Amino acid sequence: MKIYLDAGHNPTNPNAGAEGNGYREQDLVYEIARRTAVILRQNGLDVRLSRPTPETQLGTSNASSWAARVNDANSWGADYFISLHTNASNITSASGSEAFVYTEASRAYPLAQNILTQLNAATGLPNRGVSVRTNLYVLRRTRMPATLVELGFISNPADADLMANQPQLFARGVANGVLAYLGEL
């Protein structure tokens, strides 16, 4: 089973991530993706990271960065694509994890549900549910079931500190969600 883990965004522009509470999205999600890959590999899954190092820069624009991730996953023949991100809001009390899929009819929908259930169990953050988003490039251009997971809110001090200081909780939640979905947990 091949799992493509996309650590969302680039270390610098173009396509750098959100910033909040002294943290950068691209740094937080890289560390969580790296740790998730270790757990999944320990459970016998083949995992590829979109950014194998924190300095890896994909593309020269937002569009080419998204395309690089999708093309890599498609050409590798991934069975599932999971893009990890942090959320942001002007409402700093907004908290929790949520996920997006292209359609509820996809196998990505129950995968995303399992990931959110396990993230909630591991981190205690609210499960904000799975929503359909047809406008996200990484969901509509992948040839395999794909989900974009917003791990927590970088704009919320408690969420941001938890992601920065306890990345293993998020990695365990994502990995357990994948394993539960595959019937291996």
Question: What does each of the following model-derived ranges do?
Answer:
Residues S106-V132:
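Active-site-adjacent substrate-binding region
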